[in-house]
Amino acid sequence: MKAAILVFPGINRDRDMARALRLISGSEPAMVWHAETSLPAGTDLVVVPGGFSYGDYLRCGAIAARAPVMDAVRDYAAKGGLVLGVCNGFQILCESGLLPGVLMRNAQLKFICRDVHLRVERSDTPFTRGYNAGQVIRVPVAHGEGNYEADEETIQRLEGEGRVLYRYCSAEGVVDEAANINGAAHSIAGIVNDKGNVLGMMPHPENHVEDIMGCTDGRGLFAGLAQHLEKAA
């Protein structure tokens, strides 16, 4: 796996992501500064990590979405390249037009930092093949603006096309208001674009890949990506 991790001013999860990718793939990811106008040759996965790019000024991800490197990411995605955006990365992908919708302030107007449960909705995508459909995983969240919203037509299209890959749920896999930590429409935690090659998700799977963290449920996402890329090579 030859991954490229984007680095913006204010991003603070780039090294967490690099460590996770290194542990799973055995390869050193490239760190790509926001002012670059191209991606490293041979890149097979672009990661937009979490943090607070540009201090979240204007809107979360709004400034980063207009950085020079994002033009290269849009071109890369248009050609079918895999793109993963986590937390602020999800916000950046929405602001850049690579994913529909917007991430709004959490319904309870509080920053949420804790482990949550997610239900994997399907297992036949590059981003979920490391899991089983219906599997419940535990991963951390750390966000103040994770409330995914879109117009009703967009939500229905996402649901109808099976583009909701991860959904907030209880430990038993029940999707209800009590388990919806931030008020997201349809308890949406992660979605893909219409081609299925761009994923945005609010939770942080990169922080649950080692035994020392008490949970390794995040490994499935990265292991699945590695398997997909190995098979495609």
From Swiss-Prot:
* Location(s) in or outside the cell: Cytoplasm
GO CC, sorted alphabetically, is: cytoplasm
Keyword annotations:
ATP-binding, Cytoplasm, Glutamine amidotransferase, Hydrolase, Ligase, Nucleotide-binding, Purine biosynthesis
Where mainly located?
cytoplasm
* Pathway it works in: Purine metabolism; IMP biosynthesis via de novo pathway; 5-amino-1-(5-phospho-D-ribosyl)imidazole from N(2)-formyl-N(1)-(5-phospho-D-ribosyl)glycinamide: step 1/2
Glutamine amidotransferase type-1 domain spans which residues? 3-233
Per its record, the protein catalyses:
N(2)-formyl-N(1)-(5-phospho-beta-D-ribosyl)glycinamide + L-glutamine + ATP + H2O = 2-formamido-N(1)-(5-O-phospho-beta-D-ribosyl)acetamidine + L-glutamate + ADP + phosphate + H(+); L-glutamine + H2O = L-glutamate + NH4(+)
What Gene Ontology molecular function terms does this protein carry?
Answer: ATP binding; glutaminase activity; phosphoribosylformylglycinamidine synthase activity
Q: What range does the record give for the signal peptide?
A: none
Q: Name a biological process GO annotation.
A: 'de novo' IMP biosynthetic process
Quaternary structure, per UniProt, is:
Part of the FGAM synthase complex composed of 1 PurL, 1 PurQ and 2 PurS subunits.
Q: What does this protein do?
A: Part of the phosphoribosylformylglycinamidine synthase complex involved in the purines biosynthetic pathway. Catalyzes the ATP-dependent conversion of formylglycinamide ribonucleotide (FGAR) and glutamine to yield formylglycinamidine ribonucleotide (FGAM) and glutamate. The FGAM synthase complex is composed of three subunits. PurQ produces an ammonia molecule by converting glutamine to glutamate. PurL transfers the ammonia molecule to FGAR to form FGAM in an ATP-dependent manner.
Q: What is this protein called?
A: Phosphoribosylformylglycinamidine synthase subunit PurQ
Tell me what organism the protein belongs to.
Answer: Bradyrhizobium diazoefficiens (strain JCM 10833 / BCRC 13528 / IAM 13628 / NBRC 14792 / USDA 110)
Lineage here is: Bacteria, Pseudomonadati, Pseudomonadota, Alphaproteobacteria, Hyphomicrobiales
